[in-house]
Amino acid sequence: MAVLSKPVAIPKSGFSLIPVIDMSDPESKHALVKACEDFGFFKVINHGVSAELVSVLEHETVDFFSLPKSEKTQVAGYPFGYGNSKIGRNGDVGWVEYLLMNANHDSGSGPLFPSLLKSPGTFRNALEEYTTSVRKMTFDVLEKITDGLGIKPRNTLSKLVSDQNTDSILRLNHYPPCPLSNKKTNGGKNVIGFGEHTDPQIISVLRSNNTSGLQINLNDGSWISVPPDHTSFFFNVGDSLQVMTNGRFKSVRHRVLANCKKSRVSMIYFAGPSLTQRIAPLTCLIDNEDERLYEEFTWSEYKNSTYNSRLSDNRLQQFERKTIKNLLN
């Protein structure tokens, strides 16, 4: 099923707006904080992740999605496994197929790997090596963010996603060419590959091939297209990090539009805390309790709330702190 979206005005200056963070720059901590405050989104270069490693995983991913649907559905499941079109259980659909896996190698259960591939060992190794490398990059980014915020110790954020019980996941998405996405023959409308949403975790890390489609939502409500760059990684601030910074960082709303000519393949690492981790504004970032914008909740509570919502819902709204003024209204 194709989901249509009304055409939107894309600012001409949009391409130059996206912050680019050079991880080799010792002062990048300040640029990271500003990017999280202004956009909740940034591009990372000089990240240290092997290009060969990424290429191998992309090759294996393309091989998997090239299999007959009857074979891919043998590893279908919920929440982990193969899925096609249907996103979640609340009516959201898109022009996408995906493979969702547990990304925590230390949990004991390990990622869900398809056993039907021609070379499952190669795919398994690529997934493990990629996840390990991206996790390390994510820790580095979070620790630089902590430095930029002046928080001690510097592993305040990174330790939440490095715990052996972390609830992190890896998602491989494939957006096939969509003939309906040709706006000249489709009334000027876009076809939605993956509907607009925010990521609930602390932070997410995206890498794609060179096919466009990703868009982020600006504060004025407009959407800007993100030029693809297969050599770089893109980071999204998640809902949990928005809460921990008491709204100083913004969880970016984003979506993917289908392409009429080329396939888009993306890999997203979602860095989540353990299920029992309590999420609340960091006390070092607020002067007093009255400034808190959100109630405390566990990651498990928030995760469950996302399972009961639509993609486009403002899922943080129910956790916003009820002030005396709110109660009087």
From Swiss-Prot:
<dbReference type="GO" id="GO:0045543">
    <property type="term" value="F:gibberellin 2-beta-dioxygenase activity"/>
</dbReference>
<dbReference type="InterPro" id="IPR026992">
    <property type="entry name" value="DIOX_N"/>
</dbReference>
<keyword id="KW-0223">Dioxygenase</keyword>
<feature type="domain" description="Fe2OG dioxygenase">
    <location>
        <begin position="165"/>
        <end position="273"/>
    </location>
</feature>
<dbReference type="GO" id="GO:0046872">
    <property type="term" value="F:metal ion binding"/>
</dbReference>
<dbReference type="InterPro" id="IPR027443">
    <property type="entry name" value="IPNS-like_sf"/>
</dbReference>
<keyword id="KW-0408">Iron</keyword>
<dbReference type="Pfam" id="PF14226">
    <property type="entry name" value="DIOX_N"/>
</dbReference>
<keyword id="KW-0560">Oxidoreductase</keyword>
<comment type="similarity">
    <text>Belongs to the iron/ascorbate-dependent oxidoreductase family. GA2OX subfamily.</text>
</comment>
<comment type="function">
    <text>Catalyzes the 2-beta-hydroxylation of several biologically active gibberellins, leading to the homeostatic regulation of their endogenous level. Catabolism of gibberellins (GAs) plays a central role in plant development. Converts GA9/GA20 to GA51/GA29 and GA4/GA1 to GA34/GA8.</text>
</comment>
<feature type="binding site">
    <location>
        <position position="197"/>
    </location>
    <ligand>
        <name>Fe cation</name>
    </ligand>
</feature>
<dbReference type="InterPro" id="IPR050231">
    <property type="entry name" value="Iron_ascorbate_oxido_reductase"/>
</dbReference>
<dbReference type="GO" id="GO:0009686">
    <property type="term" value="P:gibberellin biosynthetic process"/>
</dbReference>
<dbReference type="InterPro" id="IPR005123">
    <property type="entry name" value="Oxoglu/Fe-dep_dioxygenase_dom"/>
</dbReference>
<feature type="binding site">
    <location>
        <position position="199"/>
    </location>
    <ligand>
        <name>Fe cation</name>
    </ligand>
</feature>
<protein>
    <recommendedName>
        <fullName>Gibberellin 2-beta-dioxygenase 1</fullName>
        <ecNumber>1.14.11.13</ecNumber>
    </recommendedName>
</protein>
<feature type="active site">
    <location>
        <position position="264"/>
    </location>
</feature>
<dbReference type="InterPro" id="IPR044861">
    <property type="entry name" value="IPNS-like_FE2OG_OXY"/>
</dbReference>
<comment type="pathway">
    <text>Plant hormone biosynthesis; gibberellin biosynthesis.</text>
</comment>
<keyword id="KW-0479">Metal-binding</keyword>
<feature type="binding site">
    <location>
        <position position="264"/>
    </location>
    <ligand>
        <name>2-oxoglutarate</name>
    </ligand>
</feature>
<feature type="binding site">
    <location>
        <position position="254"/>
    </location>
    <ligand>
        <name>Fe cation</name>
    </ligand>
</feature>
<dbReference type="Pfam" id="PF03171">
    <property type="entry name" value="2OG-FeII_Oxy"/>
</dbReference>
